[in-house]
Amino acid sequence: MNQRLPFALAALGILVLAGCGDPPREAEHRDSDTGRWYGVEQVMLGGPVFATHCAACHGARAEGAEEWFRRLPDGRWPPPPLNGTAHAWHHPLWQLRQQIREGSDPEHGNMPGFAAVLSDAEIDAVIAWFQSFWLDEIYAAWLVYDANFPDPSSHQKGLE
């Protein structure tokens, strides 16, 4: 059996799922230059912001802490890679924004919140910058994930 068959089937499944569901959301709006939700300008802004506020923990190229997958002695998790090699793509856009604004749950990690430091535009630029490292296959899988996990607060706004 061809070793690539499971990957090909998974990719096909992702593409099929991408075609299902609700109308396009924010992350699905495509920039003509990047083909992604963000533009080149955001990536260019995000690099220096990431270098200033994030690289000390997540690495200069968003590679994360060495052995990011092993708990620290205090039971918390080290900073994970954000470059598409770990689980960042398992978080929808609203959750990535929230994590940067509010920081991690103190029981799980040491990440501080940046709501008082970074504007919403800078937060989006940081996300654009690290997502620019993601392979197209990872980005496509993330789009499906993002579409299937809408921001719960957006549902509340419609009920008010």
Kindly give the residue locations of the regions a language model identified.
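Solvent-exposed, polar/charged alpha-helical surfaces in well-ordered, non-transmembrane soluble domains
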Residues: 44-48, 52, 80, 94, ...
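Bacterial N-terminal signal peptides that target proteins for export
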Residues: 1-9
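Periplasmic/extracellular electron-transfer cofactor-ligation site
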Residues: 24-26, 40-41, 47-77, 102-110, ...
